Amino acid sequence: MSTSKRKRADEAQWNKRSTKKKGSAPQAKKPGGKGERPSLQIQTLLHSGDTMITVPSGGVCDLINTYARGSDEGNRHTSETLTYKVGVDYHFVADAASCKYSNRGTGVMWLVYDTTPGGNAPTTQDIFAYPSALKAWPTTWKVSRELCHRFVVKRRWLFTMETDGRIGSDTPPSNQSWPPCKRNVDFHKFTSGLGVRTQWKNVTDGGVGAIQRGALYLVIAPGNGITFTAHGQTRLYFKSVGNQ
């Protein structure tokens, strides 16, 4: 092949490459499409100082999806909400009464869904209907058969606390050392996929009396009589759905 023919062939290949159609610009996403999901709203419940949680023998049950009506991020904007995720970050401290004894106990934390709260928050006895002989051992508690259509345990977590007969301010003699025990416990959990749907009455507050259907409770019970206080926060991730 002559040099002129080779040159013409090379020029033809170059022209083909240079005339390729350029990629079209990415199309703008349509409003409300799959690419545009509204961000989850966040409500934070702080428990410290005067608002710390006191956990007595038999436990405590607190409403946590307390979304009052309003325009802020932590408020509900419609008559229906969906709670997707919950994060709990707490520091448990055995109280002075428990620290007088050497003891070890397994406590329990639950997230409990209440289909029809009826205007009043239940007690742990209402939910689990445990006999008085099992009050100090929450690991044995189960939702009663008669109320299983109303109360649904969404999550259940265990934790261990210990006491050694000394309070935190005690100091050992100079020639001794005391082994540590779990009188102070850090408790951190994050859970998703809850799908708790709450229907609200036509009121503005976020109490249990404002809920028509779908309350979510944080239930904590001490094990073997080691009562304590809880300091920290609960964070809920939710959406306002349905009609205004």
From Swiss-Prot:
Residues 1-39 are annotated as: Disordered. GO terms for cellular component: host cell; host cell nucleus; T=1 icosahedral viral capsid. Disulfide bonds: none annotated. GO terms for molecular function: DNA binding; structural molecule activity. A motif (Bipartite nuclear localization signal) lies at residues 1-24. Keywords: Capsid protein, DNA-binding, Host nucleus, T=1 icosahedral capsid protein, Viral penetration into host nucleus, Virion, Virus entry into host cell. It is found in: Virion; Host nucleus. InterPro entries: Gemcoat_MSV (IPR000143), GV_A/BR1_coat (IPR000263), Viral_coat (IPR029053). One of its GO terms (biological process) is symbiont entry into host cell. Belongs to the geminiviridae capsid protein family. Encapsidates the viral genome into characteristic twinned ('geminate') particles. Binds the genomic viral ssDNA and shuttles it into and out of the cell nucleus. Plays a role in protection of the genome from degradation, virus acquisition and transmission by insect vectors, infectivity, and systemic movement. The CP of monopartite geminiviruses is absolutely essential for virus movement. Homomultimer. Interacts with the movement protein. Binds to single-stranded and double-stranded viral DNA. This is Capsid protein. It comes from Maize streak virus genotype D (isolate Raw) (MSV).
